[in-house]
Design a protein with these regions (language model features):
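Local cysteine-cluster metal-coordination motifs and their immediate loop/turn environment
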Residues: 20-35
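Minor-groove-contacting beta-hairpin "wing" of winged helix-turn-helix DNA-binding domains
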Residues: 360-366
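A short, conserved structural fragment
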Residues: 348-359
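Short basic/hydrophobic patches in alpha-helices and adjacent helix-turn junctions
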Residues: 325-329, 345, 352
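Short, amphipathic alpha-helical interaction segments positioned at domain boundaries
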Residues: 367-387
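C-terminal scaffold of the Radical SAM
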Residues: 2-16, 35-60, 64-337, 386-387
């Protein structure tokens, strides 16, 4: 029997693995993620703890040949060349991945050099997710980012020169009005760098962050809803015009370059989550690890499963997730005949389109519909699960 009492014969066979690397040089003003600010990153002990978590949780028995591996954070690039190599070797001692697996490393511009990229590539990384966030130095300073705009451009050049041509760039939009940010300039700069993938995130105010405290004291204000929508739709228009597919509410890709790891999340398939605060899903139950690095480390060094909680999906949960995840992507949500009339008002408003694909009727949100995703998903979920 497994530590959780499950029959090993029916353990899930994961094809996707997420590892949370919590280390950061400093906390960004908007960030409420589980991070550990460290001047010196304890990469040896981290890699050892990753291996011990794999052993305690019997990851080898639960894993098929992995299709994607994602090192997220935090700032995984803070591990450095040796740390990334040691961490991937720790994983490989317990799991295997396919020759064509997507292996992504989240990286900040200040950590990216040609030598670092070469080392990461030789360790097995074949895709980078680069946290640019803005090309405006004043905005970057306000965000408490370590890099500036020039170093972001140099990082992209280094990625290509180091041999990792597959990379995604992140930008944050809807920053406060008083920063007078030129969003159109950021988009032009982004497109000029010719990434094969882009992720855009609207700024949100989280209570336990510097931004949250500024907001509570009345020192900072959220961007108006109108500007949030205007910047999102402008990004949609410009990126689609530049040849990107807007394939998920926050993500754009060149043809054939969708993020395979995150796409697995949106399809609702099982994935393994390792590291402090990491979430995982076995197809029926969601679980999450101890959030703090020190607490996670103590648990795995004592050969304990570092689980902090878990939740089985109820039929109502499954319905809500199916609707929400389906509406997030251009693949859309399969709908039944009795639902077409329900969503006809969405079509008339320009928020969605009912299409036929692979013999199925699907509802696909437009960019304008994605701006109302929560409300539309709640409406359709309520229709499918009447109280």
């Amino acid at each position: 029997m497994s530590p959780t009492g499950a029959d090993p014969a029916v353990l899930p066979k994961y094809e996707h693995l997420y590892l949370h690397v919590p280390f950061c040089a400093r906390r960004c003003s908007y960030c409420d993620f589980a991070i550990a600010v460290r001047r010196e990153v304890p990469w040896r002990s981290f890699a050892d703890c990753v291996s011990r978590e794999c052993e305690t949780r019997r990851v080898r028995e639960q894993s098929a040949l992995l299709r994607t591996v994602y090192l997220g954070g935090g700032t995984p690039s803070r591990l450095g060349a040796e740390g990334v190599r040691a961490t991937l070797e720790a994983l490989r001692s317990h799991v295997q991945w396919a020759n064509d697996a997507e292996v992504t490393l989240e990286a900040n511009p200040e950590d990216i050099s040609v030598d670092a990229v070469i080392a990461w590539r030789e360790a097995g990384v074949n895709r980078l997710s680069i946290g640019v966030q803005s090309f405006d130095d004043d905005v970057l300073s306000w965000m408490h980012r370590v890099h500036d705009a020039a170093s972001a451009v140099r990082a992209v050049e280094a990625a290509r020169m180091g041999g990792i041509a597959a990379f995604s760039l992140d930008l944050i939009f809807a920053t406060p009005e008083r920063l007078a940010r030129d969003w159109e300039h950021d988009l032009r700069q982004l497109i000029a760098l010719a990434p094969d993938h882009v992720s855009l995130y609207g700024l949100t105010v989280e209570p336990q962050t510097p931004l949250g405290r500024w907001h509570a004291r009345g020192e900072e204000a959220e961007a108006p809803e109108e500007r949030y929508e205007r910047e999102f739709l402008s990004a949609h228009s410009q990126l689609v015009g530049a040849g990107f597919e807007h394939y998920e509410v926050s993500n754009f890709a060149r043809p054939g370059r969708r993020a395979r790891h995150n796409s697995a999340y949106w399809r609702g398939v099982p994935y393994l989550g390792l590291g402090p605060s990491a979430h995982g899903f076995d197809g029926a139950t969601r679980r999450w690890n101890i959030e703090a690095f020190a607490g996670w480390q103590r648990a795995v060094e004592a050969d304990r499963d570092p689980v902090d909680g878990q939740e089985g999906l109820t039929p109502a949960n499954r319905t809500a997730e199916m609707v929400y995840l389906g509406l997030r992507t251009v693949d859309g949500l399969v709908i039944e005949a009795e639902e077409t009339e329900r969503v006809s008002a969405w079509e008339r408003a320009g928020w969605g389109e009912v299409i036929q694909r692979d013999g199925q009727t699907r509802l696909v949100c437009t960019a304008e519909g994605w701006m109302r995703l929560d409300a539309l998903a709640a409406d359709l979920t309520a229709f499918r699960s009447p109280s």
